[in-house]
Amino acid sequence: DKGMFFTSLITPAILLVLYATFLGNIYKDSFLSSMPEGFTLAEDLINGLVGGQLMSSILAVSCVTVAFSSNMLMVQDKANGTIKDLSISPVKKSTLALSYYFATLISTLIICYVALAICLLYVSFIGWFISFADVMFLMLDVFLLVMFGTALSSIINFFLSSQGQIAAVGTIMSAGYGFICGAYMPISSFSSGLQKVVSFLPGTYGTSLVRNHSMN
């Protein structure tokens, strides 16, 4: 779906505007309130720190949620019966599964790398303190997270067979994943029991990986 693909390319820019508008001041106030009285930092340094946190939040969430949206094709093929045509063709099931995986991986990588470029451009305007090595690490982080997001969406979508089911799962992932992985709120603010639960989720470590390189 070319229309959906090009619309998805615009989504990171919209997300960045929303994050910077609503979360930027929250992050900034949080940093300022945690500093000792009488201790000050340069404005561009604080802005760079906030920008790095916003960038890590967007990338950590997008790499997984975009993968779910990209992988909707697998469920759509089940819903409209296309999978039956593919099943009777001389193609192994493993080849078909890998085709869905790599198609989702490639489209998600394109969108997420566009998101990374937009985020880096935003950070360059408000306060750039990221080294070239960290930029390379961020590109690697995005690749790893997209592989994880694609694998997770493939596993979950394997059990879905209707448009309603994928819409419900997509809504849940879009609304809840950012909180579960620690992108919107620091895991330290969760209760001790919830902290132990989310520590078993790979997504939390992916968020930490991106945040470490974007705020280094």
Segments from the language model and where they lie:
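Transmembrane helix segments
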Residues: L18-K28, N157-H213
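Short hydrophobic alpha-helical segments within the ABC transporter permease transmembrane module
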Residues: F6, I10, T82-I83, L96-L105
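Transmembrane helix boundary and interhelical loop/hinge segments in multi-pass membrane proteins
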Residues: A67-V91
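Alpha-helical transmembrane segments and their short interhelical loops
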Residues: K93, Y101-G178
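Hydrophobic alpha-helical transmembrane segments of membrane proteins
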Residues: L45-Q76, D141, A151
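Perimembrane loop-to-helix junctions flanking transmembrane segments
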Residues: S30-I46
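Hydrophobic alpha-helical transmembrane segments of multi-pass membrane transport/permease proteins
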Residues: K2-S30, G51-V66, L109-C112, I172-G178
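Residue-level recognition of membrane-helix boundary sites in multi-pass small-molecule transporters
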Residues: G3-M4, T95, Q165, K196
